[in-house]
């Protein structure tokens, strides 16, 4: 990776980190960092998430390369279906509506609660509606689908439409391994603590099952973001279609 590509990656990874933390941590209060104060948190923010997203990309690519090898051959498509010319614009419109719904609902709820206070290390007794956060993340993915389509790039939904499910299976494999390793390693140390998750009484390894179910969004969200705003470095992410 040359300097230009590295700079692009850092910009995209930082933007992805801001999206994730803004909705899931700063507003969503889904986890806290008990050992960090605000200064240290922002000091390590860019580097920490650059490494985190790199792990997301590399584990996904590793799973995808393995599955592409097992299921010999790739599925190439020379042109999109006719309905795709409209589909991605519809998805983007729905995505914008979902982002607005989630954001406005979060702000409105905080106003009704009595206001918002920024904290990364304190447990709050206010529980955010998880639907608002989920809506926002799905909305972002839908909007990114249009970005990828207008640049004649492959995308997650396009791969599924053209019967290339390897990216979907790769995300499932990669997130299962990564989540299990990261979460079990964190259990005795509590570098981050999960709070305010839906159905948090249903647990696996002492952690909310709903948290594990949300893990694929880390992959889908950042991989889509990375592909939408970079070129050569992200070509392998959804590659399976050859779009002209």
Residue positions per predicted region:
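Aromatic-rich, lipid-facing transmembrane alpha helices and their immediate juxtamembrane interface loops
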Residues: 1-244
């Amino acid at each position: 990776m040359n300097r230009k590509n590295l700079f692009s990656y850092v910009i995209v990874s930082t933007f992805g980190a801001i999206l994730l933390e803004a909705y899931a941590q700063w507003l969503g209060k889904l986890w806290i960092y008990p050992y960090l104060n605000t200064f240290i948190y922002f000091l390590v923010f860019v580097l920490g998430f650059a490494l985190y997203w790199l792990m997301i990309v590399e584990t996904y690519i590793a799973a995808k390369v393995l599955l592409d090898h097992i299921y010999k051959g790739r599925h190439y498509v020379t042109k999109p279906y006719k309905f795709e010319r409209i589909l991605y614009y519809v998805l983007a419109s729905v995505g914008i509506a979902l982002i607005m719904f989630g954001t406005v609902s979060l702000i409105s709820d905080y106003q009704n609660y009595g206001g918002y206070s920024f904290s990364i290390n304190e447990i709050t007794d206010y529980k955010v509606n998880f639907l608002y956060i989920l809506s926002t993340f799905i909305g972002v993915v839908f909007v990114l689908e249009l970005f990828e389509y207008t640049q004649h790039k492959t995308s997650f939904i396009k791969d599924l439409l053209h019967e290339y499910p390897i990216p979907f299976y790769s995300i499932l494999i990669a997130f299962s391994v990564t989540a299990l390793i990261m979460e079990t390693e964190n259990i005795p140390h509590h570098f981050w603590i999960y709070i305010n998750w839906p159905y948090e009484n249903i647990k696996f390894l002492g952690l909310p099952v709903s948290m594990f179910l949300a893990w694929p969004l880390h992959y889908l969200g950042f991989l889509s973001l990375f592909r939408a705003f970079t070129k050569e470095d992200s070509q392998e992410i959804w590659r399976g279609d050859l779009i002209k």
